[in-house]
């Protein structure tokens, strides 16, 4: 079974269950290098209830996004959480991630809310190696899986990060 089929199967299983009380936790982070713009676009997809639970455990703050009544500085806490749990190095150099925007969508299958975080890294002319450390939600959920899809140098790579292995490196030759 190839990775794409496995991801689709896992997504169907997850999305067809009650996500407020589930045993399997998933996030998807996509990194896409745009050579023309010299940027690395980053999109993170998280279930809002899981993100809110993690932020509550870490900061003691209830964001209220799940209940459609977000607190005034909810986006600040989301940014802070992402910056403290997602780290990238390109060509063996740590890079600065810039937060662009946050979107909330409801999934059609289960009507659960998903948060999309758009970020970017500027001035990336070429990528010979990339290191990703993704600790999103790992401290809150033992079965958390963080799928990272990387599109760089015409190659698509997929990482499956979890509590045991939260960091991986890819070298392009």
Language-model segments: residues:
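Sec/Tat signal peptide C-region and signal peptidase I cleavage site
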Residues: 17-21
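Sec-dependent N-terminal signal peptides
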Residues: 4-15
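N-terminal soluble domains immediately following signal/targeting peptides that reside
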Residues: 22-173
């Amino acid at each position: 079974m190839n990775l794409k089929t496995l991801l689709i199967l896992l997504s169907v299983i997850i999305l067809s269950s009650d996500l407020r009380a589930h045993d399997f936790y998933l996030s998807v982070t996509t990194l896409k290098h745009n050579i023309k713009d010299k940027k690395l676009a980053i999109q993170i997809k998280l279930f809002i209830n899981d993100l809110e639970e993690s932020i509550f455990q870490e900061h003691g703050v209830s964001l209220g996004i799940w209940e459609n009544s977000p607190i005034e500085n909810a986006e600040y806490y989301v940014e802070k959480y992402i910056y403290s749990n997602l780290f990238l190095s390109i060509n063996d150099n740590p890079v600065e991630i810039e937060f662009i925007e946050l979107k909330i969508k409801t999934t059609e299958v289960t009507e659960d809310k998903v948060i999309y975080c758009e970020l970017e890294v500027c001035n990336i002319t070429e990528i010979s190696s990339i290191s990703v450390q993704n600790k999103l939600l790992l401290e809150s959920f033992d079965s958390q899986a963080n799928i990272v899809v990387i599109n760089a140098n015409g190659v698509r790579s997929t990482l499956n990060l979890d509590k045991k292995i939260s960091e991986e490196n890819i070298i392009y030759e």
